């Protein structure tokens, strides 16, 4: 069954394996989450647990947020996300979920919002090749042909300049190198989406290869 927790990306560092290999890792701080609600097939048509992360001041929370959190005997939460596919029988409303649900060597998927890059051209945004930069070329970094004349329009799938980044991105099959329950930290091999202090969701890998 799926396990998951919400956290914040702290940054990157490196650790040494027992054989001396240098491993780049991303540090994720996941303070205890609270189960706010359990979704069941009978009531909702699917199974999931709803987790809350980071307390929100009651001055900044509205009445629905305060009332929803009160059912779990907790403070309103800044971030609320669902973990689908979790075994709801293992959780109770108001229960805390900590980093120790994962262990060293687990394979996980990490979801976050990618860094915003602003308005970018087709070379940076889509990896398009540029034209010659010399010898009288008048084509350098432009998008190029918009398509054939016959349709009298530009197709929706045409790669064009525009806003880049700021999208929900999931990186799959990342390995947990270390779990630190005392400091609520997860060390995950490689990089994860988003800037420092960005919200991330760490879940059991969907496509993890069987050992």
Swiss-Prot record:
Chain positions covered by the region annotation Disordered: 126-147
Keyword tags: Ribonucleoprotein, Ribosomal protein, RNA-binding, rRNA-binding
GO biological process: translation
GO MF annotations, alphabetized: rRNA binding; structural constituent of ribosome
Superkingdom of the organism of origin: Bacteria
PROSITE patterns (alphabetical): RIBOSOMAL_L3
Range of residues in the leader sequence: none
Gene Ontology CC: cytosolic large ribosomal subunit
Gene3D superfamilies found in the cross-reference section: 3.30.160.810, Translation factors
The keyword Cell membrane belongs to this UniProt entry's keyword annotation: no
PANTHER family: 50S RIBOSOMAL PROTEIN L3, LARGE RIBOSOMAL SUBUNIT PROTEIN UL3C
Family: Belongs to the universal ribosomal protein uL3 family.
Function, in words: One of the primary rRNA binding proteins, it binds directly near the 3'-end of the 23S rRNA, where it nucleates assembly of the 50S subunit.
Subunit structure: Part of the 50S ribosomal subunit. Forms a cluster with proteins L14 and L19.
Protein name: Large ribosomal subunit protein uL3
Organism: Geobacillus thermodenitrificans (strain NG80-2)
Lineage: Bacteria, Bacillati, Bacillota, Bacilli, Bacillales
Gene for this chain: rplC
